[in-house]
Swiss-Prot record:
<dbReference type="InterPro" id="IPR004879">
    <property type="entry name" value="Ssp411-like_TRX"/>
</dbReference>
<dbReference type="Pfam" id="PF03190">
    <property type="entry name" value="Thioredox_DsbH"/>
</dbReference>
<protein>
    <recommendedName>
        <fullName>Uncharacterized protein B0495.5</fullName>
    </recommendedName>
</protein>
<dbReference type="InterPro" id="IPR036249">
    <property type="entry name" value="Thioredoxin-like_sf"/>
</dbReference>
<dbReference type="InterPro" id="IPR024705">
    <property type="entry name" value="Ssp411"/>
</dbReference>
<dbReference type="GO" id="GO:0005975">
    <property type="term" value="P:carbohydrate metabolic process"/>
</dbReference>
<dbReference type="InterPro" id="IPR008928">
    <property type="entry name" value="6-hairpin_glycosidase_sf"/>
</dbReference>
Amino acid sequence: MLRALAPITVIRMTSTYKNRLGQEKSPYLLQHANNPIDWYPWGQEAFQKAKDNNKPIFLSVGYSTCHWCHVMEKESFENEATAKILNDNFVAIKVDREERPDVDKLYMAFVVASSGHGGWPMSVFLTPDLHPITGGTYFPPDDNRGMLGFPTILNMIHTEWKKEGESLKQRGAQIIKLLQPETASGDVNRSEEVFKSIYSHKQSSFDSRLGGFGRAPKFPKACDLDFLITFAASENESEKAKDSIMMLQKTLESMADGGIHDHIGNGFHRYSVGSEWHIPHFEKMLYDQSQLLATYSDFHKLTERKHDNVKHVINDIYQYMQKISHKDGGFYAAEDADSLPNHNSSNKVEGAFCAWEKEEIKQLLGDKKIGSASLFDVVADYFDVEDSGNVARSSDPHGELKNKNVLRKLLTDEECATNHEISVAELKKGIDEAKEILWNARTQRPSPHLDSKMVTSWQGLAITGLVKAYQATEETKYLDRAEKCAEFIGKFLDDNGELRRSVYLGANGEVEQGNQEIRAFSDDYAFLIQALLDLYTTVGKDEYLKKAVELQKICDVKFWNGNGYFISEKTDEDVSVRMIEDQDGAEPTATSIASNNLLRLYDILEKEEYREKANQCFRGASERLNTVPIALPKMAVALHRWQIGSTTFVLVGDPKSELLSETRSRLNQKFLNNLSVVHIQSEEDLSASGPSHKAMAEGPKPAVYMCKGFVCDRPVKAIQELEELFNKF
């Protein structure tokens, strides 16, 4: 049952705003519009002021659901004395990293290179020419425990600028040159070697007791999990394949049972602060939901739909995504970790919306029964609810979750049912009833801030996740929702054929454009092209293929550098270095996804230019793929497709025919590596433009062709023959 999201609070511009950020649409910038700091948005007005007054720039980058961004705002940006230092001696600029990933990634590269670590809020000091001087992340309000306080740092930078301003400008110009991406290319190792290296890395870092990889904090890094799915499929029934499936199953089940999974409100939190997947950082991101939806769905197919609990998680993520949906089909960006504990509180606390005291649950469930058992007793056992809370102090250093319980599942359904002498069916019914009661109670609490920005790249990831959920379950609700999101993109994020980066939720619930013209970035194009190809693969509509081809042409013109894809367009003079991402992290890189898109387009259209461009992507990333392939697991999967070759099914004729319908269903049931599907209804279809596909279009209908490399099997024209065809996999 779909539970409604708690009431959405949208930050809007009012006449009380103190600075220029009140004119913006970004929820993050609006959060800072009442600071006493004279904030500017990223743009020429701020840059010119810095040049005219010969002042350094203080650049602060974050996002609206960032916990430590909130902390630094409260401690420093709302402090009048600190604001005076900033206003007198600097030009202060605020950037929403989700609006401007190009700005974020450029200066984050500097911060990581100079300090050894990165994160948000990011705090960077720049010359008026936008060259970096120094930087870091969170700065405390006072000198403390060996850390310099933010006011001290401001005064130090101001003093040094007065004395050594010209020297700092020269040094900044040199730093910018060092940040220029390398353009070298070379030969790439065989994909088998690359795969073996990544697999060995995951195997050696696997936590066999708790699931996941490495030590705390643990992130649900979908890129790595997706690699293991592909690796397992490529290894057939080998011991490595079985080992990969074991690692996947342990990790995915541990995540689903742990507190990182919101058992009452659905979806997954950002990461686990400890190794047990129990206490999370409570923020929820659309890109996590979307990628994990795809991961659980692909795992469900890989394991031949054997695990009902995996299907339950697929639906659970979908339920959460429905809660963060715009009525016209888009998905909002993120939900905050922090909220007010109650309506009389003035200070937000992390996890307040999600955690429970035992007595509160007991009062809500009252004397309800499951069979002869107390519903409360069953729920307390099922979700590890303890009298003094189940949160270890080591996971809660600030005491925000004292006496609270973060729900997690430590027992199997069978164990819990046995403990209370009820059947598993009774248990499930009772737990569902309790979840509904607890959710209704949660919606009465102050809700966390919702970042209502709708980002193109994340809409693309959402579509891919939904399409894969449909393939794994064949439940049409997922496909319907994916197509609705595609319609939303066409209506609101498509600007005369090109893409916008994002749109916003207006005060009246309608979609609004931003005040600044922020064009889409390469990840917006790459992720959306992937989504369109996923839709085309599944439903066969020529319109999805045509749009994917059009966007690929635009992406190549705007972002191609000969060896991959820049983050930003060359027309943006405000960003002095065009970066190329070289690590698949919380999200994959644009080049990783684009390389696979190009190979899929080659399979469908038979144009060698796509395959050659993918090859150039691999050559451009050769050093990373050859030395640290774990950094690019998504590109490694594309490399495998390029070197091993695709398996292409060509479906010719009426898509509603019994033969083609059955073929699509069978394709949904199996996880097939490097799969491409071509749909041809007539010789006029774009997909029939290649030489071999044109010949197939002129042949018998309906028919199914299976091709690998440059060899195609004889056409299958009867359902009885499909069994033999699919037995080859």
